[in-house]
Design a protein with these regions (language model features):
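N-terminal glycine-rich phosphate/pyrophosphate-binding loop and immediately adjacent elements
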Residues: 1-45, 50-54, 251
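Mid-domain catalytic core of redox enzymes
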Residues: 201-322, 326
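Feature captures the FAD/FMN-dependent oxidoreductase FAD-binding
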Residues: 1-25, 187-216
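Conserved flavin/dinucleotide-binding core of flavoenzymes
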Residues: 212, 282, 291-467
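Short catalytic/ligand-binding loop motif for oxyanion handling, primarily in non-cytosolic enzymes
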Residues: 103-106, 184, 205-206, 245-251, ...
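Active-site/ligand-binding neighborhood in enzyme catalytic cores
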Residues: 40-205, 211, 219-222, 233, ...
């Protein structure tokens, strides 16, 4: 087993072949990001980005990896930065184990603009683990409703906030007091009979002659004996669900082609949602405390692909291990196994790999409790039907058309598209925030609200699609 100790973030991979793959990606990325850094925010930036899009939007990342490298950027072809120039053998390494950071295979058959945006705009740099709203020992700080029961506007109880992990972001936005209002969003919503509804599944959106949108939903949906069909009418409806669910779970009625053009419908129907599968299990504390041989992170070219061990604080009896992290075809091929079979097979495969390696020679199975395994299959999760909304080669402009919708057509339909489904940077929190702000700005514009700070829509950029 090759060992790569890279705690400083600048140590090269351990073999010439890996170093070559590493160098080709970093040379390409550095050339592009360095140039973008000189242009971004200037009067020339929009033209530069349009040229990049025009040059690369029809290429898959697989194509970009094999495309010959370009030694010098040419101002007469401003969108062309060449490719990575990898051989078939180097491409196979890049697909399977990346540059030591895990498989890049998830990106191979999507539009190359997605990984390019991820790289040049810094989404993949300086990543931080969100522990939550906690002290140095990992204990939650005092916060509203911590350890208390919470109920929605109709009295249904829902999960109380723990202020742990990434969910803390949602919990703080809902339960923490907004200083200007001297109350939380949760408190505000409870003042209205239908302000906050949980366990409610939207089944239809109907455009009414009055201009309002009727939202039909099943209330108390997890309790079949008490499920009740209800509806409510709104001036504006913000749509945040995964785009495939619009087609499979929600009826759209009485929206004219002017309100909802066929091109928009086609864009969200044909969006590409990546499949992904994660296999978690409980991990004995002794693995990370006493084991000095098996690495904390393993990147393999077997069906398990990537493995990560995570150390919880002492309040937890066990740590956690991600036994397998896969995307796309590598995740789909695991569908033939039950959750129990998959967890057990992952441990057996890791044991096989470790026992064959002369510098390992010991199994991982004694540390892993597969009886407490959890498998997340995003494509069969009824609330997701996919893990991240990306886009195929040639469909970047379709994705951008969904981002344009709020400004161009939402005032006619009453629908505002928000979240990962309607972005070109899926998988990160940034597009969710950006599209949320976009919806608020456009609702303010539609309702004639006064903007603060001298802001006007003239200051707000237009998303550009192919002419």
């Amino acid at each position: 087993m090759l060992i790569w100790n890279n705690s400083d973030g600048s140590t090269l991979p351990p073999t010439p072949a890996l170093q070559q793959v590493y160098a080709k990606w970093h040379k390409f990325a550095a050339r592009m990001t360095d140039h973008v850094a000189t242009m971004y925010g200037s009067e020339h930036w929009e033209a530069q980005w349009a040229a990049i899009v025009a040059h690369y939007q029809a290429l898959s990342f697989r194509d970009l990896v094999r495309l010959p490298a370009l030694e010098n950027w040419d101002a007469d072809a401003p969108g062309n930065f060449g490719g990575l120039g990898m051989s078939p053998e180097e491409s196979a390494i890049f697909y399977a184990i990346g540059i030591g950071d895990g498989s890049w295979g998830a990106f191979y058959d999507v539009c190359c603009l997605y990984p390019l945006r991820t790289a040049i705009f810094g989404f993949s740099s300086h990543l931080q683990l969100v522990h939550g709203r906690v002290d140095e020992q990992g204990n939650p700080l005092q916060a509203p409703y911590l350890g208390e029961a919470v109920h929605d506007s109709k009295g249904l109880r829902f999960a109380s906030p723990n202020y742990l992990g990434l969910a803390t972001l949602d919990e703080c936005l809902l339960f923490m007091e907004i200083s200007e209002l001297e109350k939380s969003l949760y408190t505000h919503l409870l003042q209205h009979q239908d302000g906050l509804l949980t366990d409610s599944s939207v089944c239809a959106l109907s455009k009414l002659p009055s201009g309002k949108v009727r939202v039909q939903y099943q209330w108390n949906v997890s309790n079949p004996d008490k499920t009740t069909p209800l509806s409510a009418d709104f001036d504006a409806v913000i749509v945040t669900l995964p785009s495939w669910l619009i087609e499979t779970n929600v009826r759209l009625e009485h929206f004219t082609p002017t309100m909802l053009p066929s091109s928009i419908i086609n864009a969200y129907k044909t969006a590409h949602w990546e499949t992904s599968c994660k296999v978690y299990a409980s991990l004995k504390k002794s693995f990370l405390r006493k084991n000095r041989r098996i690495p904390q992170i393993l990147v393999t070219d077997s069906f398990v692909h990537d493995v990560y061990a995570y150390q919880y604080n002492d309040n937890y009896a066990y740590d956690c291990i991600l036994l397998s992290y896969t995307w796309e075809d590598d995740a789909t091929k695991l569908a033939s196994l039950s959750d129990t079979e998959l967890a057990n097979n992952c441990v057996k495969e890791l044991d096989r790999i470790l026992l064959r390696c002369t510098n390992m020679g010991q199994p991982i199975s004694p540390y892993v409790d597969t009886d407490n395994a959890r498998v997340q299959r995003w494509v069969t999760d009824k609330n997701a039907l996919g893990c991240a909304k990306l886009y195929r080669a040639g469909t970047y402009y379709d994705a951008v058309s969904l981002m344009k919708y709020n400004r161009d057509l939402a005032e006619h339909s009453g629908l505002y598209l928000v979240g990962e489904s309607f972005s070109v940077d899926a998988g990160w929190t940034e597009p969710c925030f950006r599209t949320a702000v976009d919806a608020v700005i456009n609702i303010c514009r539609t309702t004639g609200a006064a903007f603060n700070g001298g802001f006007s829509m003239d200051d707000y950029p237009h998303y550009q699609v192919e002419v």
